[in-house]
Amino acid sequence: MSEKVSVPEIFGMNVFNDAMMREHLPKKVYEELKNTIERGEMLNSEIADIIANAMKDWAIERGATHYTHWFQPMTGITAEKHDSFLAPPSNGRAIMEFSGKELIKGESDASSFPSGGLRATFEARGYTAWDWTSPAFLREDAAGVTLYIPTAFYSYTGEALDKKTPLLRSCEAVSRQAMRIVRLFGNQTAEKVTVSCGAEQEYFLIDKNLYQKRKDLIFTGRTLFGAAPPKGQEMDDHYFGSIKERVACFMHELNVELWKLGVPAKTQHNEVAPAQHELAPIFEDCNKATDHNQLIMEAMKRISGHHDMTCLLHEKPFAGVNGSGKHVNWSLSTDDGQNLLDPGKTPHENAQFLVFLCAIIKGVDEYPELLRLSAANPGNDHRLGSQEAPPAIISIFLGDQLQDIFDQIEHGGATSSLQGGRMRVGVNTLPALKKDATDRNRTSPFAFTGNKFEFRMPPSSASISGPNFSLNTIVAEELQKFADELEQAEDFNAAVHELVRRTYVEHKRVIFDGNGYSEEWLEEATRRGLPNITNSVDAVQAFLDDKVVELFGKHGVLSSIELQARAEIRYEAYIKQINIEAKTMLDMASKQIRPAVVKYAGEVAQAIIAMKAVGMDTTAQEELLQDINENLKLLHEKLKVLEEETERAGALQEDNKTQAFFYRDHVFKAMKELREPADRLELLVDENSWPLPTYGELLFNI
């Protein structure tokens, strides 16, 4: 039985949060730091030294010996280098020091991380810079206790080399433009608008011993071979089902660690596929939520090992059952407590809500390629549009009530509501909107769910920075256009009504409340002119589109050079991932599957000879051997094809884009063709002779 835990006592105990700062810092220093955080100003060196010393003392009291600048390079995972607090010994005695300079800035080898050409190998210098909007924290593990300082990562010449920098820039951009709208509606108390975010994290748990017997899982995170088990998810008995004790023990330890780190882990349950689960936190500031999601994924992978399990975060670890995604819930809130996507109780609030809603609708319609790119990676190519995840077509679900209101506005003004009630916006009447007046459409990639939007496309293994900074920047752009127009209006109420009406009429093609899985929607989306980008290689082009380059440059989120670098990194990552998968398939097929099948076929042949010698009928055995031999021959042929295509891909002297397309069109195709005979052979060969743990063992042996 797990030990009893008092969540209020342990929550945030390993975080140098506001309470700890107030306790450990002089009042004047604390107030100056708070002002710096709230206003986004620079921190002077004297104050930094005091903060660093207090942070060090707090960490050492908790047993820390080292600190690290924790950053998020373009690998999609986090990076860290640990330094001890030990200063040069004096008179043979150890001294523990930590200066403001060490807190604020660090140095790392930028050439060893993906840079897309921004850094050559001989241009190694890169810097980490303290992000004081995300609190430092302590991590306890086998190495002891370490102070983690969230940081941004940039090059010697100032280009962003990480996921955090554009996110922070985009949060400032959307706050700047949202405040203009808020001011127009009379709010004089708010100082900034923050992006609220919460990411629902899906994952698989499998037995660690079985995991270690699968090279594909070890090297690629997904199974490259595997026949369907007798039972999958068709009984619908795993979703929200009783949580197995072994998994529950893992979840308990995970929750305790996350709560100590200030991560507001809230919901846990079984997901649709066997061995699949989900953790969802309470929504919080977008920057913290992004850091916390990285902590969640890292903790899942590490803590699963404590229970002899392995956590799989890949988007599609098993064919034939649902893969994993990450639903990103997104909204905007003022610092005086107003959710700008919450339909209000007064005409004033409802008008403001509709303006923000229209900005999002317009932005999603004008920049669908960018949102699609933000959800693109090789693993997600297996999910999107496959009857288990949203389609690759970007559309918005609003629900019947909002749809009805917009339809009425289009034709002159809304005077009734599907839910009843009325409201006034100036001289125009609109019905009152009630929270949770929308149903849930699980097939929609971008759905309004009462007081937030739920972006359901992002990959389970990826950082949520990309979806967030893309959406933030898109909305900042549309809010800027709206503010420019409304600030010049002579009749504000009339201008708001016309803006809402015009925006809906011009962009309603992106709104779809039906079944996103249907073939009819694919045809309808084509008629509407909505892009259907089916794979991550095609999606990368969005980084280089003129309108996207202009968008990010205009709002100071990413420069054209930084965007070009990110495109190169995406192409290169795809190449490397598919190359690793192809080589793993070649290794497994030639060294494990083929030898096992040959050996088993020999045993069957010997059995046929022995049975014939005593006059027994061998029809069944001969048919079995014939099936095995035909599939073994096909396996051998497809193995050679994949080997040739992989060699051709590696020998290409073209740019990364051309090489990535070759891997997609030739290598990936050859991989699928090799898998087919291998999976058929699994069903023909004695299970004791098959060299790999089967899907049945992997999915149901927890």
Residue ranges and their predicted role:
Residues 47-51, 71-73, 101-102, 153, ...:
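Active-site-proximal loop/turn and secondary-structure-junction residues that shape catalytic pockets
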Residues 76-91, 108-111, 214, 221-223, ...:
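Short linear, low-complexity motifs centered on an aromatic residue
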Residues 72, 90, 259, 305, ...:
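Hydrophobic alpha-helix feature that most strongly marks membrane-spanning transmembrane helices
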Residues 500-702:
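C-terminal amphipathic alpha-helical interaction region
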